[in-house]
């Protein structure tokens, strides 16, 4: 199995919606989460780059789909943060529609990383994202971010509680604690990404079968 070098990840493009994304080929893994879940920090920690994904002091700032290339045909996709209170309702609905459309229609999407603050996991929209992914046969890795904010016992209890809760989705959903500050959980994230990126892209599998 190839171990991809995530430090070589670089920005490719931003798109306002799925129609403006590059060709639906290769393999993509998407990162999704509430606006303050620490998504940008996780991407920066994964790639060991301070400014790959710009961390914003204003949650809800990332309104575009941002694509980063790990290697040729292997992309990380930073989806718009969702659920921020100060964003107009109309815009929230537009984002949710775009997220749902992406998860349902993007053939090269192999995995979804859902980031949640370990202190406030499984909000409605988090569950909606997991549900959409499971319905589309997409594997999910839940990262419980800011794990350093809890003492060891409380952290374990939260992880176990979420692991128990996601069984209800009847899908392939893995749950791991993560801390950008302490760089804990990064190895688990890399292992999961490696396994997704080592799969045969959907369009190549179809060609091989013909």
From Swiss-Prot:
Domain (EngB-type G): residue spans on this chain: 25-199
Cofactor(s) annotated in UniProt: Mg(2+)
Entries under InterPro entries matching the protein: G_ENGB_dom, GTP-bd, GTP-bd_ribosome_bio_YsxC, P-loop_NTPase
UniProt KW Transport keyword: no
SUPFAM superfamilies associated with the record: P-loop containing nucleoside triphosphate hydrolases
One GO term describing the cellular component: cytosol
Family: Belongs to the TRAFAC class TrmE-Era-EngA-EngB-Septin-like GTPase superfamily. EngB GTPase family.
Keywords: Cell cycle, Cell division, GTP-binding, Magnesium, Metal-binding, Nucleotide-binding, Septation
Physiological role: Necessary for normal cell division and for the maintenance of normal septation.
Annotated Pfam families: MMR_HSR1
Name of this chain's protein: Probable GTP-binding protein EngB
Binding positions (GTP): 33-40, 60-64, 78-81, 145-148, 178-180
Provenance organism: Klebsiella pneumoniae subsp. pneumoniae (strain ATCC 700721 / MGH 78578)
GO molecular function: GTP binding; metal ion binding
Positions of Mg(2+) binding: 40, 62
Biological processes annotated in GO: division septum assembly
